[in-house]
Amino acid sequence: KQKDLISYWAMDHYAGLLLQTGANGEGNYHFLKVFEQAPSRRHSAYYSFNISTEEDWAATYKQCQTPKEKALMHFIRGTRQEVLGLEDMRSIFGLMGNHEWLRIVMAREINKLESNNLSYYGQLPIAQLMQRVDKGQSLLKNEEYEDYAGQLLRFATTAYYNNRDDSFWALAKGYLE
């Protein structure tokens, strides 16, 4: 255990050095491995895994040797606050099926959608909200997210019908409806 801890600590630092030298694909791949295999270093690896260009994404993705590693890349990107994670969820689903990472990204997307776009009941009188519902208007602050919310609902519905024994998808589908 102690040897593993030290080796992942060293790999975490080595990955940072690779990024500093411009070997972004290799550096991010090492952060990915640390995230996957070393729970005590996961926080550091998550925030150090920083892909800002398509070129870096492709270079890192090329390093991945298994579908699980590729899905983990999509998981990390999909959980970022500044990213709409639906495409990453589709990739995770294609690579791993109904994996726990898929459910986590969906939960984060629902949370992001809610915190960034919904008018809270305490801020608007319930009568105003009900008038918007009666008129068929969106409850979202940013109506551009209306289509995205619909896409999330379609994804949750598909996942629900393909995984009826997983109550998470019934809950996600119901919440998004």
Task: Give the residues covered by each predicted segment.
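Alpha-helical solenoid repeat scaffolds
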Residues: 1-177
